[in-house]
């Protein structure tokens, strides 16, 4: 974990070195001042030597200014180093997340990743700043002060040594006891963020069903879980301060008592006792700093483990050593393919799939909910890797291609249509960042999106709100189809991507595809028979297997599942899911 996180110090090594340097300089200054103060009292004030007082006072003043400067510089460099460390962590995490396959993404919740990028990184930032400043300052100051007390009087110094050892043992015990609580706290933060995210993104549904009270209750429960665990952790940590105070006062009383007796017996001077008490406060303050560092490190250990987990996550998909950089054509072949999202699953999602599709063919895919239609097409763009068998595109196994090359030629319009903040043109150019406005317009005409775009006052410069909330479901689908077309793909996959458009528009899109992109292999997943009836071949999926393959006419005669869907839809009962699901 530490090695993974330490890589993100790059670019801020100078600041990370200068911070402890200035902190140690400040410690050295603070250690010398009480020693000079002892000399001022014994050799200056007690003897009435004004010259000694002025010279020693001048040295103390100069050292105080040096300590002030060192402390300020340490704070400045520490803040810069920790902020840079946090920035690098977020950049590294975000870049690694972008490389994740769908299988990697499935392991983390969206809220969990958000918590890691925000709360956990902030904890690490604070811990790193404290590490640079306190973790160097406190131990060095503690050792220096302890050494000076032994130089002044070894017997009195033993009181500090015993107190330090006892406090160290107690702090180690408390840190070990609270670590598990902070680990659980950050897991509950994931649930809290998930509750907020789900509510904000689905606020229209919440309002439509008048479920505000239910959502408030759900959020309150998540917030209470965080509260309870945090209180448990803090209940353990809160004992640190009282223990520190008791130890501090006990040490001061003991040193004062024994020191006074030593002064009476001429074993100790007044100046030496004053220095001992000053060093006592120095030692105890540094122990308090160490306690604060322990608290922060306890919290950051849990955060560090979570962040390092994301940084160390390797994509389940990787380019081969000598990848293929050209997709010959849009032909597709499934050869004895089986697939599971979970390798430990008893039954595969797809089982023994064998299928050949010629380049330029239009293929319809139909079947009931959960029949694995989407899982089938996800393998073509290598969004997932097969468990058994192979998938070939252009005569080559998809695992032999450079992933970027393959996905550039296999354009997928997913079930969940996503638009980003920006103009319509900005969204379209996700398909091809170098596309001209004319190319964007042509793609929109093919997707039957040009007409409604032209009706907007700003036309193609119309701003899309976050999530595309200012366009209808059908308009959003057509924009996503146009975006996919701008890639000039050899394979176009429409995963139920016209479900929100009317049948006339659906037919117009199909006609435009047939006339304008005849060489592109088109796979159309749909619940509507009318959307796939024109296809060269229709694949009927049932429970992860291919139930039947054929033309519309052939399947009406030979496939009970397809015939049932067709009859249900043409008889006016609406869209029909296989196996009698309406």
Which residues does each PLM region occupy?
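ABC-type nucleotide-binding domain
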Residues: 325-582
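Juxtamembrane helix-loop junctions of ABC transporter transmembrane domains
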Residues: 21-22, 29-42, 63-110, 114, ...
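Alpha-helical membrane-protein architecture signal
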Residues: 2, 6, 14-18, 90, ...
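Transmembrane helices of ABC transporter permease
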Residues: 11, 15-28, 63, 69, ...
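Helix-loop-helix
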Residues: 49-55, 148-162, 175, 232-306, ...
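Short intracellular "coupling" helices and adjacent cytoplasmic loop segments at the cytosolic face
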Residues: 47-48, 83, 91-115, 119-121, ...
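Membrane-integrated ABC transporters
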Residues: 1-33, 37, 45-59, 73-78, ...
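An intracellular "coupling" helix at the cytosolic face of ABC transporter transmembrane type-1 domains
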Residues: 11, 99-103, 119-132, 136, ...
């Amino acid at each position: 974990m530490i090695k993974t996180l330490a890589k993100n110090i790059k670019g801020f090594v100078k600041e990370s070195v200068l911070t402890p340097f200035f902190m140690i300089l400040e410690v050295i200054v603070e250690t010398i001042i009480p020693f000079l103060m002892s000399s001022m009292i014994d050799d200056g004030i007690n003897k009435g030597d004004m010259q000694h007082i002025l010279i020693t006072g001048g040295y103390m003043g100069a050292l105080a200014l040096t300590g002030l400067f060192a402390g300020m510089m340490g704070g400045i460099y520490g803040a810069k180093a920790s902020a840079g460390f946090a920035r690098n962590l977020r950049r590294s995490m975000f870049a690694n997340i972008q490389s994740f396959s769908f299988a990697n993404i499935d392991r983390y919740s969206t809220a969990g990743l958000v918590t890691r990028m925000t709360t956990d990184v902030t904890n690490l930032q604070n811990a790193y700043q404290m590490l640079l400043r306190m973790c160097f300052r406190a131990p060095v100051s503690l050792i220096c002060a302890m050494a000076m007390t032994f130089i002044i009087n070894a017997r009195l110094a033993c009181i500090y040594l015993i107190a330090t050892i006892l406090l160290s043992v107690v702090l180690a015990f408390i840190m070990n006891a609270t670590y598990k609580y902070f680990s659980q706290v950050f897991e509950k933060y994931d649930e809290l963020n998930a509750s907020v995210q789900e509510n904000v993104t689905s606020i229209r549904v919440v309002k439509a069903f008048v479920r505000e009270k239910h959502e408030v209750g759900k959020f309150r429960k998540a917030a209470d879980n965080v509260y309870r665990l945090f209180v448990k952790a803090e209940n353990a940590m809160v004992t640190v301060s009282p223990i520190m105070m008791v130890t501090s006062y006990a040490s001061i009383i003991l040193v004062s008592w024994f020191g006074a007796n030593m002064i009476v017996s001429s074993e100790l001077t007044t100046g030496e006792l004053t220095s001992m008490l000053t060093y006592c406060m120095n030692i105890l303050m540094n122990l308090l700093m160490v306690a604060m560092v322990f608290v922060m490190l306890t919290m950051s250990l849990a955060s560090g483990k979570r962040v390092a987990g994301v940084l160390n996550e390797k994509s389940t998909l990787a380019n081969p050593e000598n990848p293929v950089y050209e997709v010959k054509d849009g032909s597709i072949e499934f050869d004895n393919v089986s697939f599971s999202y979970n390798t430990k699953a008893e039954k595969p999602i797809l089982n023994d799939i064998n299928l050949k599709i010629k380049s330029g063919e239009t293929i319809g895919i139909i079947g009931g909910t959960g029949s694995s239609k989407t899982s089938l097409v996800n393998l073509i763009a290598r969004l997932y890797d097969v468990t058994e068998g192979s998938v070939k595109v252009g005569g080559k196994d998809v695992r032999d291609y450079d992933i970027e090359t393959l996905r550039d030629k296999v354009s997928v319009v997913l079930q969940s249509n996503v638009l980003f903040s920006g103009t319509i043109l900005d969204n379209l150019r996700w398909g091809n960042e170098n596309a001209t406005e004319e190319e964007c317009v042509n793609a929109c005409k093919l997707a039957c999106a040009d007409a409604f775009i032209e009706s907007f006052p700003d036309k193609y410069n119309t701003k899309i709100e976050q999530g595309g909330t200012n366009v209808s479901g059908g308009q959003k689908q057509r924009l996503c189809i146009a975006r996919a077309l701008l890639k000039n793909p050899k394979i176009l996959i429409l995963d139920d991507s016209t479900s929100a458009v009317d049948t006339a528009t659906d037919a117009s899109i199909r006609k435009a595809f047939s006339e304008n992109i005849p060489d592109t292999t088109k796979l159309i997943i749909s619940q509507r028979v009318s959307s796939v009836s024109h296809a060269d071949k229709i694949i009927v999926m049932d429970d992860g297997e291919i139930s039947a393959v054929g033309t519309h006419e052939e399947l009406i005669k030979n496939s009970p599942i397809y015939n049932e869907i067709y009859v249900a839809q043409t008889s006016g009962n609406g869209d029909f899911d296989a196996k009698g699901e309406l």
